[in-house]
């Protein structure tokens, strides 16, 4: 009888432990983050949250012929159809407004409208654009960023960044006043491209990861000696989504002319500058971006880069294929 009583006691204890475990699991499920249950609009942020690499393309564009003469010009509709014909790109990138938003905005707006008419949305083709340098004119930078966001973009890249303060100013320009920012209350055509109401857009068009439910992302690029000197202070600014070394510009900084006038790259110094930015990304737990090609994307993934942009065309398409295979996507 004594042994039977002990067996019943063990059974009761086991049942009690299981019951407590089930209650704890239920409580954890009931207190899950609402952001996890809300449908993510911007798939780029979804990939970040999943720890996945991502691969994007420069938007196709009309090119100049020899001597600057215009070749056969494609319409915005044709460019949009060309864009949507390649489905392996996680986002569409454009540097067309780096020199001047005012000059390039009309063509970009027409292109985005053509994308929308062809069926694109933030869910299928999120858009990222370069904005001109911020530090030279802070007031103009705020207007520029607002105008770009109003076209429906979900990411803005700050170029030539050299200080933490200019990053903070740019990040504020991406956020409405209700979220502590300086963006105008005008939303332009952004809700239409996102496929949501204006009211919902105002709620969701905030900066991730500062707002875990936000759908906007910032990219910041360091591409000068001063920027490199301040890269840790820049990377420490909360709100940067992806930090990039400006590989092309940095290549120029670490190149000289030989006796015949040819360019000579200091490969070691150039690579050290790239690794300096990558080290800052790792220290402050920020995704790091790189403009890779099919020959180096595997190496860059191994080093720790996770966001890549490629030029439009066959070489870029091949690079995405190589990158997806190397990253397990």
Describe these PLM feature segments.
Residues 33-329:
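Expand to "…catalyze enediolate/carbanion chemistry for C-C bond making/breaking, isomerization
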Residues 1-11:
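N-terminal secretory signal peptides that target proteins for export/translocation
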């Amino acid at each position: 009888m004594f042994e039977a009583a002990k067996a019943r006691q063990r059974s009761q204890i086991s049942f009690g432990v299981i019951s407590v475990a089930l209650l704890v699991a239920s409580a954890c499920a009931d207190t899950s983050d609402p952001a996890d249950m809300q449908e993510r609009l911007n798939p780029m942020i979804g990939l970040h949250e999943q720890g996945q690499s991502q691969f994007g393309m420069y938007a196709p564009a009309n090119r100049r012929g020899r001597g600057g003469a215009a070749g056969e010009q494609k319409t915005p509709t044709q460019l949009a159809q060309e864009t949507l014909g390649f489905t392996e790109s996680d986002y569409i990138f454009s540097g067309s407004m780096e020199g001047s938003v005012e000059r390039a905005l009309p063509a970009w707006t027409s292109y985005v409208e053509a994308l929308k008419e062809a069926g694109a949305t933030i869910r299928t083709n999120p858009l990222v654009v370069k904005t001109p340098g911020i530090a030279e004119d802070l007031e103009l930078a705020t207007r520029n960023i607002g105008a770009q966001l109003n076209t429906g973009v979900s990411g803005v890249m700050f170029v030539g960044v050299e200080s933490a303060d200019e990053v903070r100013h740019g990040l504020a320009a991406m956020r409405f006043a209700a979220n502590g920012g300086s963006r105008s209350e005008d939303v332009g055509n952004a809700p239409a491209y996102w496929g949501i109401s204006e009211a919902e857009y105002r709620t969701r068009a905030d900066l991730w990861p500062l707002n875990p439910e936000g759908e906007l992302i910032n990219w910041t690029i360091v591409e000068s000696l001063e920027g490199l000197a301040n890269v840790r202070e820049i990377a420490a600014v909360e709100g940067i989504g992806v930090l990039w070394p400006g590989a092309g510009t940095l290549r120029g900084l670490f190149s000289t002319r030989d006796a015949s006038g040819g360019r000579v790259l200091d490969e070691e110094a150039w690579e050290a500058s790239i690794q300096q930015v990558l080290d800052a990304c790792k220290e402050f737990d920020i995704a790091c971006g790189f403009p890779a090609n099919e020959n180096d994307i595997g190496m860059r993934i191994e080093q720790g880069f996770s966001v890549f942009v490629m030029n439009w065309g066959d070489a870029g398409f091949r690079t995405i294929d190589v990158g997806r295979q190397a990253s397990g996507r």
